[in-house]
UniProtKB/Swiss-Prot annotation:
Gene Ontology biological-process entries: heme A biosynthetic process
UniProt-annotated binding residues for heme: 274, 335
Enzyme class: oxidoreductase
Main location (coarse class): membrane
Gene that this polypeptide is encoded by: ctaA
Membrane topology summary: Multi-pass membrane protein
Cofactors named for this entry: heme b
Function, in words: Catalyzes the conversion of heme O to heme A by two successive hydroxylations of the methyl group at C8. The first hydroxylation forms heme I, the second hydroxylation results in an unstable dihydroxymethyl group, which spontaneously dehydrates, resulting in the formyl group of heme A.
Descriptive protein name: Heme A synthase
PANTHER family: CYTOCHROME C OXIDASE ASSEMBLY PROTEIN COX15, CYTOCHROME C OXIDASE ASSEMBLY PROTEIN COX15 HOMOLOG
Species: Rhizobium leguminosarum bv. trifolii (strain WSM2304)
Length: 367
């Protein structure tokens, strides 16, 4: 029988302890990034709900950090806004002081986005150079950084859609912008969850991992639909529940031609699909919870299933309240915040079925 080498065991234990310290630091960093992303999405939602997204008509990644500081600079910024259709057709009586109200939302949104780039890139460089990032995670983290850079271009691409002909931004580009933000959020959540300790509880069923993936992906699809609702102001189409102006299925869902375009450009149809999506997500998480509680009660997987169903139920209630109150700003933002919480937890739940990233040992490193 082989006798363990105390020196080798000590080296392995030392390596694991060091890796655990590094993982705690990475989790703290990614958690802070997730919090910043959450704030960014909320400010972006407020920018949309207050119709502030077109208040800054130029893309100046570096110079744009500094807002107007004098009356003359404010007049110049306002003059640029006066050139676009939104001002000419909708806001032609707006004053400079009123313009400042919408300007600050868009400026804050862009400033936070730039700040997130810094708080992601600089720690990433530091952790990389000091050898604290495991090899398996280096390029995925670089990929998230690249998505962040791409998101900046997508944001301007979205804004530019409302500067020449339209009086608002394209709902397609708005949805793309929000989905990309969610993908960046999901990437950070996935890695942070993989760096966290996991229980050894068995999965409730063979299909649990696939079902968790389905829920997470469908939650993202529901967010995409929500972005279309916001982009088309579809939240004002039907402000009754559970019926839609007295009908389960309204008669004016397919009034545009070709018929399929209604799913993207008819506000009433988009709201209807978003409602159906909410019912579907509710059903998926209910089934998931029932399976988990029956097959593996008292496990961490069952507890996650209960929490996920509870979050979706709460989000549905917030959505209904927002609808009935005709989308007041604070309720609209609460609904958007709830969507990101549901999606983030769905990603963490999905990642939970894969277990913690394996620890590298001193022997493996030498090999």
């Amino acid at each position: 029988m082989a006798v363990a080498n105390p020196t080798t065991e000590q080296a392995i234990l030392s390596e694991v302890r060091k890796q655990n310290r590094d993982r705690r630091a990475l989790r703290f960093w990614l958690g802070f990034v997730l919090l910043a992303l959450f704030c960014l999405v909320l400010v972006g939602g407020a920018t949309r709900l207050t119709n502030s997204g077109l208040s800054i008509t130029e893309w100046r990644p570096i110079h744009g950090v500094i807002p107007p500081l004098s009356a003359a600079e404010w007049e110049e910024e306002f003059r640029l806004y006066q050139r676009i259709p939104e001002f000419q057709q909708l806001n032609n009586s707006m004053t400079v002081d009123e313009f400042k109200g919408i300007f600050w939302w868009e400026w804050a949104h862009r400033l936070i986005a730039r700040g997130i780039g810094v708080i992601f890139a600089l720690p990433l460089l530091y952790f990389w150079l000091t050898g604290r990032i495991e090899k398996r995670l280096r390029w995925p983290l670089v990929g998230i950084l690249a998505l962040g850079g791409l998101q900046g271009f997508i944001g301007w691409w979205m804004v530019s859609s409302g500067l020449s002909v339209r009086t608002d931004v394209s709902q397609y580009r708005l949805a793309t912008h929000l989905v990309m933000a969610c993908l960046i959020f999901a990437g950070c959540m996935w890695i942070m969850r993989g760096l966290s300790p996991h229980s050894n509880d068995p999965a409730p069923a063979r299909s649990s991992r696939g079902f968790a993936a389905t829920i997470a992906i469908f939650a993202l699809f529901q967010i995409y639909l929500g972005a279309l609702v916001a982009g088309l102001d579809a939240g004002f189409s039907y402000n009754t529940w559970p019926l839609m102006d007295g009908a389960l299925i309204p008669s004016d869902l397919l009034i545009q031609q070709p018929f399929w375009i209604n799913a993207f450009e008819n506000p009433k149809t988009v709201q209807f699909i978003h409602r159906i999506g909410a019912y579907t997500l509710f059903a998926l998480t209910l089934i998931n919870m029932v399976i988990a509680l029956r097959a593996a009660p008292w496990t961490t997987h069952a507890r996650r299933a209960v929490v996920l169903f509870s979050l979706v139920t709460l989000q549905a209630a917030i959505g209904i309240a927002t609808l009935l109150m005709q989308v007041p700003l604070h309720w609209g933002l609460l609904h958007q915040a709830g969507a990101l919480v549901v999606f983030g937890f769905a990603i963490a739940n999905w990642r939970g079925f894969y277990g913690e990233y394996p620890h590298a040992t001193a022997i493996a490193e030498r090999g």
